[in-house]
A protein has these predicted regions:
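Short N-terminal helix/helix-N-cap motif within the alpha/beta-hydrolase-1
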Residues: 135-139, 166
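Phosphate/oxyanion-binding loops and surfaces in catalytic or ligand/nucleic-acid-binding neighborhoods
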Residues: 161, 174, 197-201
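Conserved N-terminal segment of class I S-adenosyl-L-methionine
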Residues: 1-118, 124-126, 138-141, 156, ...
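Conserved beta-strand signature within the Rossmann-like core of class I S-adenosyl-L-methionine
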Residues: 152-158
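Short catalytic micro-motifs in class I SAM-dependent methyltransferases
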Residues: 128-133
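A short glycine-rich, Lys/Arg-flanked "PGG" loop and its adjoining helix->strand segment in the class I
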Residues: 139-150
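A structural helix-start
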Residues: 134-135, 158, 162
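Short, glycine-/aromatic-enriched active-site segment of Class I SAM-dependent methyltransferases
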Residues: 162-182
């Protein structure tokens, strides 16, 4: 059972520029472990069945797959069959659960800055409900492009913060997003802005939202993408 213990330090002295990456990783790990426990985010994944079906279809079999933000492996478990999967996450407690439950390789990493993996080493990278948590998604996407093989597949999803109901919420004076871990509110245009820097977008759909078939920008509750790496083989 995970202990519901508030992190001892949530706000380091930002004036001290010598705070190193290891301490940053530890602070973020404590924060996310606390958040996932208190907000009851463990052992669940948003739109799990629909997203896992889409991801499995797109990635296929016999692939080397990197799951960015695998957490406790709730979504990851759907595509480990006949694939070699490596999971990365900042939440150390959740990551230990993932390694134990799925018996896959995991790495405790703050991938918002750098991903310590070899260039052109993966066929597929998955980022399900991850990039909204990143302070600088352009850095992570550039790293994803580097790690992917030429023409490799980058798939993922992000909440569509500007779907119709959320726009009404804002008109009523409410916040567009009340999740304290979300650092960016994405719409179709912003998502394309980041993806197209490193990738070629093949598909952009929504896995939830009754009227999303009319317009994913207005009625899709999430945005689900399938991209190819722009990086080409050098012959």
């Amino acid at each position: 059972m995970v202990e519901n213990k508030k992190p001892s330090v949530l706000k380091p002295d930002l004036k001290d520029e010598r705070i190193n990456q290891d301490l940053r990783t530890k602070l973020l790990s404590d924060f996310y472990s606390y958040h996932h426990t208190t907000c009851k985010r463990r052992n669940q994944s948003v739109s799990e069945e629909k997203r896992s079906t889409i991801f499995k279809k797109w990635m296929g079999k016999n692939k080397k797959v990197l799951d960015l933000g695998c957490r406790d492996g709730r979504l990851t478990r759907h595509f480990i069959d006949q694939n070699e999967v490596v999971g990365l996450d900042i939440d150390k407690i959740a990551l230990e659960e993932c390694a134990k439950n799925l018996s896959i390789e995991t790495k405790w990493v703050d991938f918002s800055i750098q991903i310590p993996l070899q260039t052109s080493s993966f066929d597929v990278i998955v980022a399900g409900e991850v990039i909204e948590h990143l302070p600088c998604p352009a850095i992570t996407m550039a790293e994803a492009s580097r790690i992917l093989k030429p023409n490799g597949l980058f798939i993922g999803s992000v909440p569509n913060s500007y779907h119709f109901k959320n726009r009404l919420r804002v008109l009523k004076g409410n916040l567009i997003d009340n999740d304290q871990t979300h650092l960016r509110a994405y719409n179709v245009m912003l998502l394309k802005h980041y993806l197209e820097k490193e990738f070629i977008i093949e598909k952009l759909i929504s896995s939830r939202g009754r009227s999303s078939f009319l317009s994913i920008a207005w009625f899709g509750r999430d945005l689900v993408w399938k991209c190819r790496n722009k990086k080409q083989l050098i012959i």
